[in-house]
Amino acid sequence: MALNLEKKQEIIKAFATKENDTGSCEVQIALLNERIKLLTEHLKANPKDHSSRLGLLKLVAQRRNLLKYIKRTDHARYVVLIEKLGIKDR
């Protein structure tokens, strides 16, 4: 259920703003987005797994807060990021 190392490195490479960048908002949001996708698939197969559902809600809230921060500080980065990830603009 967790991201494997290769997938995580692939996401970091795709969204990094500079070399060895693992902590920028773009990278964090992309990693959260992938974890949210995995948890969503898990919950489709296991609808009674309430602890995973709560974890999913926490991840979505964390992603939403990071997206709000990027939107507030640099709107151009925000637009590019949501287009790359395929997230709807609220």
UniProtKB/Swiss-Prot annotation:
UniProt xrefs under PROSITE patterns: RIBOSOMAL_S15
Gene name as annotated: rpsO
UniProt cross-references to Pfam families, sorted A to Z: Ribosomal_S15
Protein name: Small ribosomal subunit protein uS15
Organism: Helicobacter pylori (strain Shi470)
Taxonomic lineage of the native organism: Bacteria, Pseudomonadati, Campylobacterota, Epsilonproteobacteria, Campylobacterales
Alphabetic keyword roster: Ribonucleoprotein, Ribosomal protein, RNA-binding, rRNA-binding
SUPFAM superfamilies assigned to the protein according to its UniProt record, in alphabetical order: S15/NS1 RNA-binding domain
BP terms from Gene Ontology: translation
InterPro entries xrefs: Ribosomal_uS15 (IPR000589), Ribosomal_uS15_bac-type (IPR005290), uS15_NS1_RNA-bd_sf (IPR009068)
Family affiliation: Belongs to the universal ribosomal protein uS15 family.
Function text: One of the primary rRNA binding proteins, it binds directly to 16S rRNA where it helps nucleate assembly of the platform of the 30S subunit by binding and bridging several RNA helices of the 16S rRNA.
GO MF annotation: an example: structural constituent of ribosome
GO cellular component: cytosolic small ribosomal subunit
Subunit structure: Part of the 30S ribosomal subunit. Forms a bridge to the 50S subunit in the 70S ribosome, contacting the 23S rRNA.
